[in-house]
């Protein structure tokens, strides 16, 4: 199916995303460090990036902007535990296709991943 990156500064959140989406047949690569995820996206095929907005060194929106430079066609879903209209607007304006509110809901994540990958 799809090659997916999951970037969250909380290791368990990445593991949860991997468990949910691997059952749907996707290959999920989890990261807790922004630079590692960006580097991976530059050198590997990635269909979808699932990025937490609040990270350690930079925001998920900054990470998305860097990934878009390397892979303009990459699709993205932003994760946030602090949803605001501003954050949603900024994420969408930078090319995020969707966003999910944490804690992650399995059905919502599966539905949004499916929708974004269909284009």
Give, region by region, the residue ranges found by the protein language model:
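Short amphipathic alpha-helix used as the core "switch/output" element in two-component signaling
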Residues: 61-73
